[in-house]
Amino acid sequence: MEFYFLGTGAGMPSKQRNVSAIALLHPKMTWLFDCGEATQHQMLHSPIKPRKVSTIFITHLHGDHIFGLPGFISTRAALEGTTLLTIFGPKGIKEWLEATLRITGTYLRYPLDVIEVEAGQTYEQEGFHIHVEALEHRFLAYGYRIEGQEEKGALHVEALKQLGVPSGPLYRQIKQKETFVFEGTEYQSTDFLGEPKPGIKLAVLGDTVPCEGSLRLAEKVDVLVHEATFADSEQDHAGRFGHSTARQAAEIALKAGVKKLLLTHISARYVDQEQRLEAEAREVFEESYLMTDHQSVVIKG
């Protein structure tokens, strides 16, 4: 499982960074978080296939986070995507998409389900638990917390060998079922499994100033994706426009007890001094990393 950053810039495209779009890649699915202008073009230079994208989460309706959505939806159909595409986003996204697709005469070969979210709501999506919280921006904005299911512990192979259980299909049954039968005797599978492994926990935040919603979403996650539009010297400016500095993002990560912080939504004004932002974050939280376009990060629990 990994994050793949398609766009890490703020406000408008630059020569170095496209606007917001992040893919979450899993062997069983591909998700997107935001879909700014030219996201589908960024995909041409990535391992991501548009027709494989099954779910898109939109954090808010500012253009740098959604203007790539109609084009992506259309291209997904042209590339023979036929499976359901689900889009989560703030109130208004359904009306905007329906009007855009209608006016442009866009025909989709697949079902499209647009779900307008509210703070505090939870969803089950493709085996993951999704929780939504409101953030504090100049515009209605949300963040998403993603939690995977608890995984069963590792097999106690030596104990099974001592019992005489041969490797093969029965091992798979032990991992999948509550009990198993060997040579006429029923056993509890848990007696031959290690401690359960907690499911992966992630949080992807939209544009925001530091707020309680950010802390709730980020609490003890394995990876937090947080905007870092400005340097610390621009903190007042960041607040006026509903954004965070890299240091403020790191403070959220520290308070919330996260394992790793990925910084994105970087202003073009820092094109020659981006490491300054990362350094300011690391003064507070060492596991802070400033992302670039087409950078991927493997997610570990």
Swiss-Prot record:
Superkingdom in the source lineage: Bacteria
Function recorded in the entry: Zinc phosphodiesterase, which displays some tRNA 3'-processing endonuclease activity. Probably involved in tRNA maturation, by removing a 3'-trailer from precursor tRNA.
Q: Which residues bind Zn(2+) 1?
A: 60, 62, 137, 207
Q: Which UniProt keywords apply?
A: Endonuclease, Hydrolase, Metal-binding, Nuclease, tRNA processing, Zinc
Report the gene name: rnz
Q: How does it assemble?
A: Homodimer.
Catalytic reactions on record: Endonucleolytic cleavage of RNA, removing extra 3' nucleotides from tRNA precursor, generating 3' termini of tRNAs. A 3'-hydroxy group is left at the tRNA terminus and a 5'-phosphoryl group is left at the trailer molecule
So which cofactors does this thing need? Answer: Zn(2+)
The record's active-site residues are: 64 (proton acceptor)
Concerning InterPro entries, the annotation shows: Metallo-B-lactamas, RibonucZ/Hydroxyglut_hydro, RNase_Z/BN
Please state the Enzyme Commission number of this protein: 3.1.26.11
Write down how the cofactor binds this protein.
Binds 2 Zn(2+) ions.
Record keyword Hydrolase present = yes
Output the Gene Ontology terms for molecular function.
3'-tRNA processing endoribonuclease activity; zinc ion binding
Q: Which family does it belong to?
A: Belongs to the RNase Z family.
Tell me the protein's name. Ribonuclease Z
Keyword Nuclease assigned to the entry: answer is yes
Q: Which CDD domains does this chain map to?
A: RNaseZ_ZiPD-like_MBL-fold (cd07717)
**Residues engaged in binding Zn(2+) 2:** 64-65, 207, 265
Q: What class of enzyme is it?
A: hydrolase
NCBIfam families given for it?
Answer: PRK00055.1-3, RNase_Z
